[in-house]
A protein has these predicted regions:
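Contiguous transmembrane helix-bundle modules in multi-pass membrane proteins
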Residues: 1-7, 137-325
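Periplasmic/ER-lumenal interhelical loops and adjacent helix-loop junctions
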Residues: 14-133, 234-273
Length: 325
């Protein structure tokens, strides 16, 4: 039965997989006829993309926290400084050419990926429910979901976790045709909401004891709130808010103002996350204590999740990206 279940989705997707395989033979991911690089050295890979190219978009280990704090490292690489920031006031004091150059390179993003359209944010509210689910649900589903999330996260680190990445590139079929290793986080973005729904089902079940619900809620809340408070009060001391590609490294006056802006963005997002987690925690507590009913609890949590995701997503996909015909 297990083999049949595994083969069914493979057969359903076989047309697109076979078409992709056929196309790849005529693309840059196919076997190369050129065996040397421009400098005369031997090419690293002849059957697919080379490791440096594959791992160019490797997620930073620390940067992975933007899964729950969207602008932990500044958000996307197109993020701009605030109009009322100290850096913007400094830019206004420059002449036109200098101001344009400084503004152009004043990036709030300080991660080490070359281009990031938007953070891979899954929602602090969903992550809180996911933590609650881990503590509440103890079955086979928890095991395979945690394994899938862990492997996906490690693979998304690419060159920052080279042992596993090199192993996959060298021995896993067609992995050397994978352009951006960070995109494998789609597995995380699928598994966390899925398990959150499983956890909610058990949390709302009458068969689950009140003490189980309260303990799960307490531990999830304490852990996440403690983590958020550590970042809020000590984050600016722990982190340096500098990337490996700082344009203004030789201009400390500009760099210090840019770091100050990054710290502001960081703390404002962390504070926002704290408010959302507290709202979720209070809502669940009121339900467990039978102060509010299940339907109202579900409605409030749904609205919190929608607000949490929408307020971030609208910064990257909004009416400015669309035009009327």
């Amino acid at each position: 039965v297990l083999i049949s279940v595994g083969l069914l989705p493979l057969l359903m997707n076989s047309p697109s997989l076979l078409a992709t395989k056929e196309y790849s033979e005529f693309s840059t991911r196919s076997k190369s006829d050129i065996t040397i690089n421009a400098d005369g050295s031997a090419k690293e890979s002849l059957s697919g993309l080379d490791k440096e190219y594959i791992t160019e978009y490797s997620y930073g280990v620390l940067e992975s926290l933007n899964l729950i704090f969207p602008r932990f490292m500044g958000g996307g690489s197109s993020e701009r400084i605030r109009e009322d920031s100290k850096l913007m006031n400094f830019i206004r004091s420059l002449d036109a050419n200098q101001a344009q150059q400084v503004y152009q390179y004043s990036k709030v993003y300080w991660g080490n990926q070359p281009i990031v359209a938007a953070p891979a944010y899954i929602g602090i509210s969903l992550f809180f429910i996911f933590l609650l689910s881990i503590l509440l649900v103890n079955d086979l589903n928890r095991k395979w979901i945690l394994i899938a999330i862990s492997i996906s996260l490690f693979l998304s680190w690419g060159k920052n976790f080279s042992f596993l990445t090199d192993l996959m590139i060298d021995y896993f079929p067609l992995y050397d045709k994978f352009r951006a290793v960070s995109s494998i986080q789609i597995i995380i973005e699928f598994c966390i909401p899925l398990f959150a729904v499983m956890g909610l089902s058990k949390f709302f079940s009458n068969n689950t004891k009140e003490v189980q619900k309260l303990n799960s809620l307490k531990y999830a809340s304490v852990f996440l709130v403690s983590l958020i408070l550590v970042f809020y009060f000590f984050g600016t001391s722990i982190l340096d808010f500098k990337s490996d590609f700082e344009i203004f490294s030789q201009y400390p006056e500009i760099l210090n103002l840019l770091i100050e802006e990054r710290q502001y963005v960081f703390k404002s997002d962390v504070l926002r996350s704290l408010i959302i987690v507290v709202c979720c925690s209070i809502t669940f507590y009121l339900f467990v204590k039978k102060i509010i009913k299940k339907d109202l609890t579900f409605l409030i949590i749904t609205l919190i999740v929608i607000f949490d995701l929408w307020i971030v997503d609208k910064n990257y996909v909004n009416s400015d990206q669309f035009v009327k015909k």
